[in-house]
Amino acid sequence: IEKGTIDDYKALRELHYRSRHPGMVRAIYRAVVGEELAGVIVYASPHPVLRPRNAALPFLREVMREGMQSYLRWINEHFVRISRVIVYPKFRGIGVAVELVRQTLPLEGRPYVETLAVMAKYNPFFERAGMVRIAAGADPERRRSLGAAYRKLEELGAREDVLLDPELFRLWYRSHSRREKGEVRDALRVVGEYWRRKGAQRRVPLARAASRLVMLLNPPEYLIWKNPDPEYSGYPEPLSVVTSPPSRRPSS
């Protein structure tokens, strides 16, 4: 495990399930096996506000009450975020991801390291590397509504890959009768209601609502690590794992 560059990330980025930019990059490290690039880990600036972060560290609510500007400054100074962990397929299954996380966690000199990752539900390598999972409690009624919407779209023939790809979704949607299109719109209305509750004012486009439905049913896991260096002994430890019902992963 050694210091890497943006070129190392670019060499493997197509293998990651998220194609968007990893954020404001602070550091990149790479794993090398022999002479081959086996994996990369990208550290980036933290997200401004995260509910599970406040659940793990309740004192942050007090910091927030002092003003958003000072809160954001505090978060940027004391947190760093793992934005990407990518392992080349040839080297998967031998612990590369665990070592990329474990060996680099202390290197950024922050009291806290955090990450949001959907795949953490299915591959607990972050926890094996020493991070603590904070599973925010899900709203059972909300999950039932989203699940019912997904099942309705399944009945109409939608697969997960169709819902996630806007162009495939549009083609699939156009292939249906007027009555079936109405059923699709009715099913996806629950997503629009969700975003209006979050403060969005504009109507959510249908194709975007379809992809959001899948994402809302598969929210990312939040994990946090407290630096054990004596320099950070005065910072609070994250609370124990908050359990919640396991998320339902829609079938493909």
Predicted regions located by residue number:
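Conserved acetyl-CoA-binding loop-helix of GNAT-fold acetyltransferases
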Residues: 87-106
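Terminal substrate-recognition subdomain of acyl/acetyltransferases
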Residues: 1-81, 105-252
